[in-house]
Structure formats: C-alpha cells, structure tokens
C-alpha cells in the first residue's frame, strides 16, 4: 500500500504517483494507493491492511507523515515500511540511506532489505527520528505557521529565530545523575540528523538501542554557529557524565532513557512537528520498534 501525503513538500504529487503506479505494475506487484488523513485516524486503513494481508506500507511524505503512519501500524508484526521522502527535512529517510530522488527511493523499496529500526517515546508521544526542546522547536512552530514550505522557508525561519534566541533552563537526569543547564536547545535523536543531511548527532544509529542527546549550552551568541558546526562535522566526541557539565559548549552523550525537566516551558517538537510543551519529559528507547526498508 502506498500512503501519500497530498500536502507534503513543495511539488505536485499526481505525476509522481502515476510514475510509481507504472513502475510497480511493471514489476508485477499488486498495490493500492491511499492518502494520509489530516485527523490522524487510520482505523480503516489498518483494517484493510490486516484483512487483505498487505505486506508493505510505503510512505510518500516527510518525517511528520512517517511518524504518524508508523505509530498507527507498528503493532502489525509482519508489516514492513518504506519511505519515498517528500518532506522538507526527510531526516529518517536520509539517515537510513534512502535516496533523495523519489524514483530511486522506489527502486530501493523494490530491491532493498527491511531492517529493524528503533524509535522512542517522549511522555505519551511516539518519535521515530528526532525530537527537540528549545530553539529548534521554536523554528518548527514558526515553520508550521508559514504559508510556504521547503528548505528556503525553514532556513529563513532559522535565521529569524537565531537573532531572537535566548537560552532556557533545564534539569537533566540520567540514571541517578543530574545536572542543571541553561541551553539554547536539547536534541533527542534516534537518527543522526535534523534533516537535509544536517547531522546533529553524528554517532547516532537507527538500531543501537540508544538515544543520542545533544545539549547546546549557553554561550556567547557569536560563538553559537561555530560550536554547532563543530557538532555537525563530528568534532565533538561522546562524553561521560562528570560533576561539572558546564565545561563544554555542547554536551553529547548516549543513553537508553532520560528525564528532562523543562523549567521555563521551552517549546517542543516531535519529528519536526510542533507540539504542546510540558514541564517534564520522560524519554525511553523502543528497541527494534519497526522494520524499515533500507539499502
């Protein structure tokens, strides 16, 4: 089953869907095209998948669509998921090595291998890629409210928010160890990137049973872009918990679970989708949560 988000990305979908139909028919594969729901209710889709024994669901959309579909269908044990990335960021797809070009991604779905992939819960929510608290979440909220989509609009909102950004107060608790921090943002990552191959958690793996946590701490704002660039380039190594966590501009560590107290109610996003924030976030990995078709 192909599940198409009709509003994801910036291009028209009709030509792409027609090409997908032709390519799939040429492989003599039975298929059906359906569309995602704005309400998030997939009961009818799920009943059809189970009753008619669909083996694969191919998501044509971005990270938010992937989150919604996987969360609804992940309890069907035999089901495999594919992604044709058509969103603004496509972080999970690119982290998994799925090609950017839609028809190349389709050929991977035909010929690739389904591999177990982790996800995580954050309070009562599901995340399969990356969630964040603070600056990046503010960008996600403003991007969602924008009239236009795409990388240009996302970059524009990032620049606007950079000049207004102020650090937020957090308490971070990991396995009995805790520390307070003033930070511009905290990223909780299963994939290695925000999207568009911007790698915020270079050591992240989709199936290692660990969350990668990146804490961008308070620093002079002129230093902030350079510090983040060092993180993106992989120059910041994973670290152990130490008594004084203020020694580094950016903290980077791994853990299967974490508790974050959001003392100033910084904004929050899940897989790039703006969410209502909370004063506390309990985060836990879900090992081998679903099967994703990859190279």
Model-based region annotation:
Residues 64-77:
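Short Gly/Thr/Asp-enriched flexible loops that form oxyanion-binding sites at enzyme active sites
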Residues 148-153, 202-225:
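Gly/Ser/Thr-rich active-site loops/lids in small-molecule metabolic enzymes
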Residues 132, 187-201, 274:
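Glycine-rich phosphate/pyrophosphate-binding beta-alpha loops
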Residues 174, 205, 217-295:
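ATP/nucleoside-binding phosphotransfer catalytic cores, i.e., glycine-rich phosphate-binding loops
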Residues 27, 34, 75-188:
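Catalytic core of DAGKc-family lipid kinases
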Residues 66, 88-92, 222:
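Short gly/pro/ser/thr-enriched loop/turn and capping motifs at secondary-structure boundaries
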Residues 1-57, 71, 178:
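ATP/NTP phosphate-donor binding region
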Residues 6, 60-62, 86:
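Glycine-rich beta-strand-to-loop/alpha-helix junction loops that act as flexible
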């Amino acid at each position: 089953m192909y599940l198409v988000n009709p509003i994801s990305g910036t291009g028209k979908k009709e030509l792409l869907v027609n090409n997908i139909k032709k390519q799939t028919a040429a492989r003599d594969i039975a298929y059906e095209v359906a569309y995602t729901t704005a309400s998030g209710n997939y009961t009818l889709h799920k009943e059809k998948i189970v009753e008619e024994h669909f083996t694969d669901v191919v998501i044509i959309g971005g990270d938010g669509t992937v989150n919604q579909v996987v969360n609804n269908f992940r309890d069907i044990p035999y089901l495999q998921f594919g992604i044709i990335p058509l969103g603004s960021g496509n972080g999970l797809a690119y982290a998994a090595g799925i090609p950017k070009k839609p028809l190349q991604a389709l050929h991977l779905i035909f010929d690739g291998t389904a591999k177990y992939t982790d996800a995580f819960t954050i309070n009562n929510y599901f995340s399969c890629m990356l969630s964040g608290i603070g600056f990046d979440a503010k960008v996600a909220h403003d991007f969602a409210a924008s009239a236009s989509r795409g990388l240009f609009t996302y970059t524009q909102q990032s620049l606007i928010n950079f000049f207004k950004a102020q650090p937020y107060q957090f308490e971070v608790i990991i396995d009995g160890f805790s520390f307070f921090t003033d930070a511009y943002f905290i990223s909780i990552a299963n994939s290695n990137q925000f999207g568009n191959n911007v790698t915020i958690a270079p050591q992240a793996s989709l199936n290692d049973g660990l969350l990668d946590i990146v804490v961008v701490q308070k620093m002079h704002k002129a230093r902030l872009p350079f510090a983040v660039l060092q993180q993106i380039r992989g120059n910041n190594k994973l670290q152990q918990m130490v008594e004084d966590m203020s020694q580094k501009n950016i903290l980077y560590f791994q853990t299967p679970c974490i508790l974050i107290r959001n003392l100033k109610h910084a904004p929050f996003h899940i897989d790039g989708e703006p969410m209502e924030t909370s004063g506390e976030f309990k985060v836990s990995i879900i090992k081998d949560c679903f099967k994703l078709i990859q190279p």
